[in-house]
Amino acid sequence: MVPVSFCFFFLLLLLSAGESSSQLVSGPHITDVNILLPPKMKNPVEYRLQGSDGCFKWSWDHHDILSVTPEFNSSSHCSTSARLRSISPYSGRKETAVYATDIQTGMVIRCKVFIDNFSRIQIFHNSIKLDLDGLSMLRVRAFDNEDNEFSSLVGLQFIWKLMPESGGSTHHLAHVPLKESPLTDCGGLCGYLDIQKKLEDSGVFADLFVVKGTKIGHEKVSVHLLEAPLTHIADEIVLTVAEAMSLEPRSPVYVLMGASFGYTLKVMRGNVPQAVDLPSPHHRWSVLNSSVAQVDSLIGLTKALSLGVTTVVVEDTRVAGHIQGSSINVVTPDTLILYISPWSMSGDLITESKPFPSSMHWYVVSGRQYLIQMKIFSGRPDAHEIYITETDDIKLYGKDSDYWKIVSLPDELSSEYGQRNSRILNAISPGLGELTSTLTYFSGHQESKEVLKVVQEIRVCEKVQFTLNSEDDTPKVLLPWTPAVYQEMELIVTGGCAKASSDYKWFTSDISILSVSAYGIIQAKRPGIATVKVVSTFDSQNFDEVIVEVSIPSSMVMLQNFPVETVVGSHLKAAVTMKALNGATFSRCDAFNSLIKWKTGSESFVIVNATSEMMMLDELRSMDSSPPCSRASIYTASTGRTVLQATLAKEFHYFDKSLSESIDLKATLTIGAYLPLSVRQDSDGNHHGGYWFDKAQEETDFGVSKLYLVPGTYVDVMLLGGPERWDDNVEFTETVKTLYEDEEDLTSRVNVHHEVDRRANMYRISCQKLGSYKLVFLRGNLLGIDHPVPAVAEALLSVHCSLPSSVVLIVDEPVNKLDVIRAASQADRAPGRLRVTPVTVANGQIIRVAAVGISEFGEAFSNSSTLSLRWELTSCNNLAYWDDDYNSKMTKSGWERFLALRNESGLCTVRATVSGIDYSFKSQYSTLLPQGSESTLTDAVRLQLVSTLRVTPEFNLVFFNPNAKVNLSMTGGSCLWEAVVNNSRVAEVIRPPSGLQCSQMMLSPKGLGTTIVTVYDIGVSPPLSALALIKVADVDWIKIASGDEISIMEGSTHSIDLLTGIDDGMTFDSSQYSLMDIMVHIEDDLVEHVTVDEDSLSVGEHVATSSFKIAARRLGITTLYVSARQQSGGKVLSQTIKVEVYSPPRLHPQGIFLVPGASYVLTIEGGPTMNVSVDYTTVDNEVAKIEKSGRLYATSPGNTTIYATIYGSEGAVICQAIGNAEVGLPATAMLVAQSDTVAVGHEMPVSPSFPEGDLLSFYELCSAYKWTIEDEKVLIFIASSINVEENAGFVNVVQGRSAGKTRVTIAFSCDFVSPGLYSESRTYEASMILSVVPDLPLSLGAPMTWVLPPFYTSSGLLPSSSEPQKHRDGQSHRGNIVYSILKDCSSRADFERDTISINGGSVKTTDSNNVACIQAKDRTSGRIEIAACVRVAEVAQIRMKSEGIPFHVIDLAVGGELELPINYYDTLGIPFLEAHGVTTYNVETNHRDVVFIKTVNDQPSAYIKGIKHGKALIRVSIGDNLRKSDYVLVSVGAHIFPQNPVIHTGNLLNFSITGADNEVTGQWFTSNRSVISVNVASGQAKAISQGSTHVTFKGHGLKLQTKVTVLFGNTIYVDSPGETLTNVHVPAEGYKFPVKFRENKFAVTEHGNKATFNCQVDPPFIGYTKPWMDLDTGNTYCLFFPYSPEHLVHSMSITKDMKPHVSFSVDASLKEARRVSGSASALLIGGFSVTGPDKLNINPDSNTTIISLVGNTDVQIHCRNKGRLSISLIKRDDFGIAGHAQYKVNVLRSEQFTDRIIITLPATGQIVEIDVCYDTGESLVASSKDGYSVLLKILWGVLVLVVSVIILMKVIDRQVPTGATGTATYSGNAAQGTPERRSGTVIYHEESPRTPSPFMEYVKRTVDETPYYRREGRRRFNPQNTM
């Protein structure tokens, strides 16, 4: 153990030592610690002493000889440098010191300053030789007599002179002014150039002098001081000017032995290198070692003689000693390497490409040129390139090849690249070949030579090229992009000798714009232009590039490749493409396929497979169309036209905050559908020997393809369906074509006449001659605008002109139907065409008898009127006769007659025979009818006259129940009948009672199924029969037919209709409902089921009819469903409907006063809310106008009535609310305050008002508020919200200063303007007198006095123990602290009356104006103190005040939420400690469309939420007393987030814009970059140094600003707890967020104790926090208490995008310095709660129940035995952490059991178990036995517990004295004397307020001022363990 401890201690020492050393290194610094300055002179000398890493305060010793001027940075808060200047004349050498004190760390740095006179000066320079046209900087330095250099000469005046050395007049140097020189002083940080330039401008010189070389030679430079009496001090130097020389080739030069080459000499003239022509008269050449090389002295020609190193020197003879040299190395070669580089067609080397050596594979591109260089190297491993001369033997082979050609360099480039060692390769075609190069050289002796050889393989490849789909192959790709949509496109590339996709490398110039995969698939990332580059892996120079532009789609158009109309029942194809802003079409855009939404304006056109029509893509490509972005197939269900619309809508700011745009593209196309073109017969042949058709039936149900006409007749036909005329821009065609076989003119045989005058689609077809013809009708639209494909339909019609081959008679039919004609023509006939089977008809009526012509094919003629008929009756004398009168009235044709039947039975024969041609056609068609045709053109039928039997109803649906009965009625026939059922297992016939045998028949159901009841009338011959269908079924469904949502006014009733039926849709008769056991099930008692006869309560009563009534009892929304019992015992349930009970609607406000030009948003309180709409109207629009949103605009003075009408979903009026509005001009104004008095030091808001209204009525129209106070010694304005520009000065706050009365006055002007209707301006002035009540002369108890309302019981304000809660003894219910009320014992009445009393930890009050003090006694120590005093007062004032709302103005972002705390004050403006539920308050605003207000019962806060941009005034008042009101102006709009942050140095903070309508773009700025820096584009800020500054955002029409405070270091640290945070099963002490402090001036008080701090949670709606300190450990925490799920459901603003978890932060800040703060973030996972009992008791009468959950509904629910219970979700409102769900529990088995339902939340592990008990009532004995056993177990457990408690109490009593002995002493330095605490039990209320800070200050001050009070062993603590 000891070694471990020693190691640990040693480690701590090392760490502390490391920290100390790091602090020494990182402290503040200054630039100099010793400074030498001259004394005061005519021109003062200044020196800047620069500091760093600190903020300094400057001081110095001798203020008479030295002046120190601090310099501050741009924020003027910190000094980092100071200017030093001597201020005393010279009187000997002096010494002083300057001290730089870092105000942050307190570190002091001392700088010694010496002041002495000059002894000498000296010119300092870097070189005495300078180049021609070059610059040189000369500087004067001064020294004292000890040769110490002076620190600065800036400010002194000097005289500089230039003089040729030889004494001539030609100067070799020229002076360059400082302002024209390139010198800088770094902005004053590295020099004093500004002062030196000013000296030169004034005509003298400074200590700095710049010269320029102008001519080769020597120049004298002299300087002397221009300061009396030191003008004799001077200095002089000589400078040399020469030309700068350079040699080529550059030194060092490596050559082979025997090489010969010449140098090129260049000189700098005018800063431009120029070659010198050799030989030159001014230059001579020489070599240092002539055995290695020799050089020509005039022209510089050099030859290498032997291996070695030497130097060639060239000298300028004009300047002595001016030479330039070049090193020559004569070497032997080691390697020969070939290099290849791309060569441009213009003859230039592509410099950005790197040459490839022969050690690599060479790949070249066909069609390109390359530079091949042969290079020789020597000296491994540090190889040096050898300079190749003309004498070197180097060769290149392989010049001629099928794949390339090699040529020499042009002459003008040979000098640059080398004629001998460079070639140009022209690649011709792909292939593989070789190049060979050799070098022959001397190996060291002139006699022997050696050869170097290199062979290089070259492959010629095709150029890498993109293959684009565009027609011109323009190397540009255009891709669309929107957030979260990344369009992809595969790029096709060829060339590069590639064999696989891996032989290419892909690059993109900007990966943030475009990404590219290894397979060439590009993906758009954001808008912009990027270049995609594909490179061959073999040759990096073989590449291709394509420009890819990514842009946001600007428009969307339909592709014009498909028909726009088609036949009903088929499909239309459509496709869209998108275009960029410039109109260019995107190369590919199919990634938007799923985002583009298709819809039509009609339900007749159905979108099918809008995103998967891939076949259409191939069709579009084959059409050479633009690439489609989305495709759709539209099914045409019915005719008509509609607009097909494709939309692409997307918001940007949800994905990227930097984007402010949104995309909303639409493309429309008119499409249509038409019925198939058909021909319909329009003229009726019913009266003319033809068939009948129903003109009234649907046009699509009847068409004709064949017509049979007798010559001379006609028929009208109509074209049905087909395309309608599209529009005027599209040609419409409608024609008829005739097809025939022979060449005869058709017009003589059949005539088609278009009936234009009647209807455009009507044709008359007349038959002229015999024959068969075919007509083709064409109708449709051709090509045109918006009609790209023709749509022409056709219909065929065959016309047969012939004579009938037979005729048939139609008997007792109102018309000649085709089916009747067909049946009659196919009937059996006897000779003479007499129909064998008689036709039975009922007697006693007039029947119609008609004849129809039949063709040889058995088809009925359409018209046979050319032929005439003869009618005959046989054996009908007593039975029937022709009714000529009736016949003449009903018809004029001979092809139909009317026969009157007598009331007799028997047989009668009717015959019709064609007798010839009608007289009107005889002249033209007399020869049509052949001779002898009468024998075939005849028909006869026998009529059987009888009475008819009928059974009604013919169908009956019967509920399967033994008690059900079916009654059938019979009419006609005789009374002798027999009934037979074909399935006796379904139903049986019951004989009716006596007297009803002839008219009724009864059936009873026996089983499920269908049966036919046949009734035979045996009284007629032959017997007649009638049929009825009976279906016996069980009920399959029951439905509420009154709708799924019903709204009922409170107190009224509503009737609900029912339907029952079976699966095929048939319904039961209401008479059978009583057999179905129909029950009504209502969720709760909001509504009740009442009987039809009376409004008595009958919940759960059976319904025996098809409707029932419900009565509305309470407000709210509930659900209702009905059930019916099947014969099998099962139940069928109807749909669940919502029933809303609403209160009578009321217009809010019901009466309102406004001034002209003002507006107010009215709302409806009460009324229905489900599927309703509200329409607002005013009676007089000249007085006020109102919008649909309810916004009322006052226009001109007057009165009007406002109606708010509520409509249902079908447009029916449900209810109406009425209000009134008065518009007027107030004559006077008044000033309003909530009280006439205010206490000294307290505040009260005041505002103007009118007698007829308040601020809500006029504040928007008034401005120029001017507030004055008559006597500012009595009152002052402390926090004015006046802002003239924003017209927000209507509220001010006054504070009492001293006793007295004074007048407060306001003046303002109002512009009552209603555009175009009313305009007037007025000025108002109002005042009031306020009294200021002074404090009492002695009121030390005022700060510790709690103000409470009368007759009030507070929360647990009085803690009963001083111990932390976790240390309290859980077994003791007695606290350590005892409280009592101090009373006046002299008055017995006052003593006995408890005006203020204590109840547990609460304080109870009675009457007002009572004061009492509470005494606290610690029973363990015996200490007695005054805990607090209580004053009882009436609530007189109300405020919306908090630290976040100091000036009655709030800035709120759109969607942002804020809690407005509501506080109460007495008549003097003193706040109440508590006043929960004492009075009611009302919160109102004039613009509810701008802000949403929500108040929660029993919570002293109002919650507001920004809805849209604008301003709204919020008023809070006590009840309806408008004088007791406070106002807050809310401005909803865009804001910088976060607002007014406080961060610490070195930290980062991301600013953003919230609450904007659209995503905004702009730039960020900071007003002080030394405090904080901010990224201009992103808004990311970094804290640099301590201070305050402003961050500004500037966008399009938007400028926002916020203040930023930067603190030095983190002073408060807040950590998050490690456990999972949820709002269910919260620890009793809450969740602990540890708070740690850094020991600095912000966090430590003068006595060393931790300062108090505040805690706050954001967002506030999820819970609350309070600070807490553990007195044992000294640790501090923010305790977080989340609200329960029930609280969140009722208090939160519900939105659909809420999640089951909420991210929140806990902030801690110092009370003394709120800027010093810290925060920690955490995640709260919502839990759930089950509303209702924890045990479900179910019985057979109600075998279902509902389980309701609130909170997080992402739960798993199951039971142990799934065979007994079924659990199903019936409703779920998924609102995240505040959701709501309902589950239905059904019992599946009718047997007694118990089970358990388990509900689990996987996110938190929360489990809730619910016991289920199903009791059938069958067994009571067993349950009683079980109950006895359980009771015995409980009694036994209680007995054991009681005995254990008794034993434990005795043990505790014995231990108490021991612990109490140590409670009397306190020792500050001995831990052994610390007493053992006795714990008491304290229950803290969750909303217990803190002890007021004034009271705590009073306690501290009392302790500090108490004489002889020992503080050593005491520590201050809060009795409530709170800060």
From Swiss-Prot:
SUPFAM superfamilies: Invasin/intimin cell-adhesion fragments (SSF49373). InterPro entries: Big_2 (IPR003343), Ig_GP210_15th (IPR056232), Ig_GP210_16th (IPR056233), Invasin/intimin_cell_adhesion (IPR008964), NUP210-like (IPR045197), NUP210_Ig1 (IPR055096), NUP210_Ig2 (IPR055097), NUP210_Ig7 (IPR055099). Its main location: nucleus. It is a single-pass membrane protein. Keywords: Glycoprotein, Membrane, mRNA transport, Nuclear pore complex, Nucleus, Protein transport, Signal, Translocation, Transmembrane, Transmembrane helix, Transport. One of its GO terms (cellular component) is nuclear membrane. The chain crosses the membrane at residues 1829-1849. The keyword DNA-binding does not apply. GO terms for biological process: mRNA transport; protein transport. Residues 1-22 form the signal peptide. Residues 1152-1205 form the BIG2 domain. It is found in: Nucleus envelope; Nucleus membrane; Nucleus, Nuclear pore complex. Glycans are attached at N73, N117, N289, N609, N863, N903, N967, N982, N1171, N1199, N1550, N1568, N1743. It comes from the Eukaryota. Belongs to the NUP210 family. Part of the nuclear pore complex (NPC). The NPC has an eight-fold symmetrical structure comprising a central transport channel and two rings, the cytoplasmic and nuclear rings, to which eight filaments are attached. The cytoplasmic filaments have loose ends, while the nuclear filaments are joined in a distal ring, forming a nuclear basket. NPCs are highly dynamic in configuration and composition, and can be devided in 3 subcomplexes, the NUP62 subcomplex, the NUP107-160 subcomplex and the NUP93 subcomplex, containing approximately 30 different nucleoporin proteins. This is Nuclear pore complex protein GP210.
